């Protein structure tokens, strides 16, 4: 996570670790399926999204980049368009260059 955080700082796309609370894991359980990806409550979407993804990445290092919030901006930076920002692309490229 530290390498990803540093990459984000280098390209002005900040990220940080968020906990996945056990309650959010429980909300991914379904009465009619193994899992569900939405609990009909519009709060904590990033954390609940990570709780859902966690079921598919057992035993590997992973990160959930929730880009919904920064995907569009009203006051774009010099490298952003006023439409979609592409948030996360620069971060991942910097991380891979490592």
Ranges and model annotations:
Residues 1-98:
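A generic structural signal for tightly packed, nonpolar segments enriched in small/aliphatic residues
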